[in-house]
Amino acid sequence: MATKDDYSEDLENDADLMTDFSDDEYGYRHEEGHNDEEAAPNIEEIREAAADLCNQIGEYDYGDEHDWDGEQYPRLKRWKHRPRALGSLRSLRKLWKMDDDDPTRKVARAFAENEVLQHTILPALLESAGQGKEGDAIALACTDLLTAMTWPFDGLEELREQEKQGHLDLAELSEITLLDEHLVNYKSVILRNRSLDQQHDVLGVVMRYLLLPNLATKHHERSTLATGIISMCLHLFRNLLAIRDPVTTSLSSVERLSNANLQSELILSMHKHHILDALLMLSSSAETQAYNAWNAVASECIFHIFVGTMVKTIAEPTFSGSGTRMSHDSTPNASASNTAGSSSNANAGPISSLAESLAMETKLKRASASGKIATRHSRFGTTINFVGPDGELRVARNQAALIKPVAQLADEANQKGRRRAQRRKDAQEKGAPKLKSKWTPDAALVLQEWADTFVQSGFEPLAKSVLKDIRSERDKLGDLDVARVRIMQLGAFFLEYFLLRRTTAAKRRNAAKTAGSVQSTFAQRALDLQEPDEQHERSGQSAEQPEEAEEWPFELVSQWLEPWAFRMVLVRTIQSQETKAWLEFVASVRLWIVLLRLVDELANSKKESERDVAEGLQAEFYYMGETLEACHAIFRSYTTQSFAFLDAIIAFAYVMPKMLERYASNRDHMYVQAKKQVHRSRQDGDLDTDQDEARQIKEQLQETRSEREFRFADFQRKLATKQLAKACIVYLRRWKDNNGTEDQLNELVTVMHRIAIKANDYRQFFLATHRDYLRFMISGDTISAFEARAPTSAPNLRKLIDYILRKFSKLSPEEQSIYNAGKQPTRQPKPPRMPAEIVVRPGMTPDQEIGVAVGLLLKKEKMPAVLWIKSALEMASAMRTELVLRYEEEEAQRSIQGAGDDMMLLGELEKHNESPVERFQPYELAYHGNDELRTDASLMPELKLLCRLVGLEANDNELVNWRWSVPKEILPVHLDQKIETIERYIREPLDTHGRELTALVMRIRKPRVAGEADADVLDPADLPDGWNGAQSDSDEDGDYFDRIRASRSLVSADHVAAEGGLLRRSGPKKKLSHPTKGDGSRKKKQIQRIKQDIIDDSDDEFAFALADLQPQARTDADADSSSDDKEEEDDDDDNMDDQETPATSSVADLQEQFDQGKSNALDALRTAKQQRSNTEQPPLQDAGERINRRMDTKRLFLADSDEDDDDVLALSSQEPADISATSDRTATGPSVWAGIAKKRRLAILDDEDED
């Protein structure tokens, strides 16, 4: 993470390191203006300069000769440094910096050839430390140079980088690959060199004389030099840990074999000199200000120790052979089962000799079949000519062809012709840590003890501080992408380590309980034989023993059991997949898997509080809609990546669905967030400057994310993709070559079973390439090798392959031919469905909502549809206006005619009290054979929105043949208002203040009803030609970006009812029910109420009628006061009309007679008025004269509006209009119209008083 000069800049400020030694003496100091290639020294000059500088540092002082096996040898007495030792070391350091701009690394190669580190730097460091101030300064300079020379270096990667940059000197560039071997030699010399007195080694000197004195200094007393020294020493440890051990074989040299376990030797040396304890202290104190500066380098050291090693090799170390120490935490069963065999590969685990023999036999057979095995040539050769089944002449050139049938030879020839050159598959992603060699038993035990302490005290503080620095983008971390990947890999390793140690402790505890129960049985038997007093004492002692505390509680990793950890892996997975940063992708998926396993273990805890925490974590994580989408993206992500990538995909496909299925199975209903489609302008964060800011904030607050019901069967069906099936087949091919474990094969078989059996999508494995390999596995010896290495999972794999091949054999020949061609049968296209309807967003007036709908239709060039609605409203308004005027004519005629007998008067009264609204009929909009208009009215959301906004009702019994109609409850005056609104927005579109019309509406889905999953599926035969199911922008490009679950009617008509235009809501037409007894009583009640209103309209007119026409009725008028109380009781008991009618009493009969007489008198009064008025009957009014309709409609509306108090209260504001309309009618019939106006005015005032 850090660079080479981060700590050396602090060291250069020390006066002890400054010297008057001049670099110009050798002429290798870079000056300004002398950076040309001609001035650059060659490797010979650098080698000579390095040798001279080494001579200036010092040398061993040889003493007297001593006898060794009869020969005389000089004896090393002591190290003697020269006067210019410090200057020479500093000059070597500057000479080393020349490699910063040299791609061929001449200085590094010259130092390695001169063995500067072995013969000069290490002796000076070992013999000068602790020898006063000058000796400590020399030791500090040597450590500085030692750190620079051991800096991590990847020769192959450097070579590729230089080739990309265009350096053509490949002869010199190829030399830098040898620097990796030099680093291994440096590590070996550093670990094995000791001082002359054999009391000091390099790590001990650095720790004792450099690191500890400066690390023990208090924070406020620590100088810049001390900080640099601490950083330098830690970087030296990091460099040594980063140097990997060489890969050895049986043919490797002795030197290479001796260096095969350098990492284990380094761990033991660091443990001996308490360097591991220092790293543990820095980790546990990483959040403190005193030690936070070195959290990055400490995490790097821990990363290079553990990452790249299988967790089981540290958490559950098992060693074979006698004399090796076993782990004190490993169970006897585990150790006995894992000591059956060993292998040179540390990560493959123990493999039996039978498995190795079968693998070798399979390899030999494969080589023999391909003709690559060495054979003994006969004197006549091995070329065979044969004619294949297709009639072509072919040639076979191996001896095995002598005993093979022609069909098999032809098949092999065809396979060889189709064989393509495949590039070598990588085992790891580029930049991933290399796999470490096998740890020695002592080193593994040391690492286990240290890892236990680290998880308990240092893991969480270190991870928390490093993640905080990554968010703050600290410079000490270097490349942030690399730091982020490493901390995720470190977290995944130690979380998995925690799980394994917890499982091991639980097994050991259960075994102890089992053994304890057996011992307690014998103890109880012995206790029964003792005296009663002794029994009481023993039982008391056993009761006082406390319960054993949990060894690995979840509190140790509580930081990772928080929502931020899941959000982090989710975000990093999505971003790394978009940028194709596969190393980070693998690290985040691996951490995700371990977190899921950790939550699963937490959910199975015995403590209820821990189970509640796991429940909350899963509920919050699964509820996020991005989680399930990211899971499906992971399942489809494999193409040609490495085996590590493939292993992560298969492991995730094994763990994630398993946990999700278990979580969903415990719930009747599970809801997750639906995908939210945000408009582009809102994604960019733009706000409309012309629009009111408060209104925009209100709209943003009203936007909520919708929910949808989650079904695991749908999730599992989407999991079965061709990408995941391909990943399974490729993983199956590469599992044996990469020394996979049985657990990995078990995960693979489970994933394949989920695809083929549970998701019922076995056709994903029917492709020719997949099927051929499955048949090759089951027919050859490959499955036998699998069974030897995985005796539990391989039989299940065999059964699954048999099942898939049997399913393919049952296909028709036509389908088999399609799969043999490498294609899949085309799936039937999904049937078209009813497009989702839309509504206008809240916050707009009713007129503006109509303007939005008109604008959307005009934008889609649907002007004929708008005019179709407008003309229908005009026709319905004209027809209803005519009915109102005809009613007025009939009323005028009845007022002129004389009064008849009582029975005739009663019939005329009922006809007279009939409301014009009752004569209205629903007006159905006709399509006139226009199929396009019929389809748009049934399927287009914009057109249906306009229909609902103007109050139309729909009969949606047929999906593609909706019948729209104008309800009979809408009065002509309100129809005219809708017509005027449509005309206004056709002339002048709605001003949206710069916003798109599509941003003002939102889609709305009807709630799902059980058993109606296919209720909105359209029949393609009913659709016109050219209709592709995308009739609306809402289904094309997601302009209506907000979907909500419908919990109310599609269009709320509360604003229409508030205007008094509708007597009920306008919405989807309800199903007609059969008339009941309650409906008849309600109608009868309405008629009686109309009669009573007319009777009680005017007491003055009633008195006039009694005085002028029927004097004998005056005696009956005296009973009026006695019937007032009874009339009030009748008005208060209107709610009893739906119940059974009680028997009439004498008082009720008297009231009926009085009302009948009053009605007769009122009819006689009207007859007299008609006789006195000899005016002409007013002509039928034109539909354009709409002002004359107001008074009549108000009066008629008043007669039917008792059930809606809100509508009645709205009439007081409309009274002046009624009076003005009445004044226009006095010209034709002043007395008639004056009387009617007076009656209506009194009726309105009476109703207001009652309210």
UniProtKB/Swiss-Prot annotation:
It comes from the Eukaryota. The keyword Nucleotide-binding does not apply. Residues 7-25, 1118-1140 have a biased composition (Acidic residues). It is found in: Nucleus. One of its GO terms (biological process) is DNA repair. Residues 1141-1159, 1168-1178 have a biased composition (Polar residues). GO terms for molecular function: DNA binding. The keyword Cell cycle applies. Keywords: Cell cycle, DNA damage, DNA repair, DNA replication inhibitor, Meiosis, Nucleus. Residues 26-37 have a biased composition (Basic and acidic residues). Residues 1-40, 321-348, 411-436, 529-550, 1059-1089, 1107-1191 are annotated as: Disordered. Residues 330-348 have a biased composition (Low complexity). Pfam families: TIMELESS. GO terms for cellular component: replication fork protection complex. Transmembrane segments: none annotated. Belongs to the timeless family. Involved in chromosome segregation during meiosis and DNA damage repair. This is Topoisomerase 1-associated factor 1. It comes from Mycosarcoma maydis (Corn smut fungus).
